[in-house]
Amino acid sequence: MVPAAGQLALLALGILVAVCQALENSTSPLSDSPVAAAVVSHFNKCPDSHTQYCFHGTCRFLVQEEKPACVCHSGYVGVRCEHADLLAVVAASQKKQAITALVVVSIVALAVLIITCVLIHCCQVRKHCEWCRALVCRHEKPSALLKGRTACCHSETVV
């Protein structure tokens, strides 16, 4: 005999009620202590047999699956951290290259600034320096000498 649709619906409803009652909270005491459940971790240390399991990472033992897993170091991917992550390597390389370029440019700019300050100081305050005179007086126009003015270098005046 084939049951009617109403009977099937009642049967399904009965099963659903039975499952809900089974899953419902009860006032019976817990069999395990709640502290022990909170302390249990999903990972344990890998046994000695798996110390070399991960190529570029740290080994952890999955408690539920009872097998080792790897936490890869930066720049490596794969189940056992066996593959280099090229995108991470390129990004790190570009960052290092940019920092190196910035340091080099800063050092060169600082050196140019220091040399410029020394030259200005020497040529403004101490025009009697031999190398300053050679640098400054070399570019002096003879028109200043012809008009009877004092030249940039103290030793050259027109009478």
Curated annotation (Swiss-Prot):
Extracellular topological intervals: 24-97
Span of domain EGF-like: 42-82
Top-rank lineage group of the source organism: Eukaryota
Key words, A-Z: Cell membrane, Disulfide bond, EGF-like domain, Glycoprotein, Growth factor, Lipoprotein, Membrane, Mitogen, Palmitate, Secreted, Signal, Transmembrane, Transmembrane helix
Disulfide bonds: 46-59, 54-70, 72-81
GO cellular component, one term: cytoplasmic vesicle
UniProt GO molecular function: epidermal growth factor receptor binding; growth factor activity; receptor ligand activity; transmembrane receptor protein tyrosine kinase activator activity
Transmembrane segments: 98-123
Glycosylation sites: 25
Lipid addition sites, S-palmitoyl cysteine: 152-153
Pro-peptide positions on chain: 24-38, 89-159
Cytoplasmic side: 124-159
Signal sequence residues: 1-23
GO biological processes: angiogenesis; cell surface receptor signaling pathway; epidermal growth factor receptor signaling pathway; ERBB2-EGFR signaling pathway; hepatocyte proliferation; mammary gland alveolus development; negative regulation of apoptotic process; positive regulation of cell division
Protein's job: TGF alpha is a mitogenic polypeptide that is able to bind to the EGF receptor/EGFR and to act synergistically with TGF beta to promote anchorage-independent cell proliferation in soft agar.
PANTHER family: PROTRANSFORMING GROWTH FACTOR ALPHA (PTHR10740:SF1), TRANSFORMING GROWTH FACTOR ALPHA (PTHR10740)
Subunit relationships: Interacts with the PDZ domains of MAGI3, SDCBP and SNTA1. The interaction with SDCBP, is required for the targeting to the cell surface. In the endoplasmic reticulum, in its immature form (i.e. with a prosegment and lacking full N-glycosylation), interacts with CNIH. In the Golgi apparatus, may form a complex with CNIH and GORASP2. Interacts (via cytoplasmic C-terminal domain) with NKD2.
Protein name: Protransforming growth factor alpha
Protein species of origin: Rattus norvegicus
Name of the gene: Tgfa
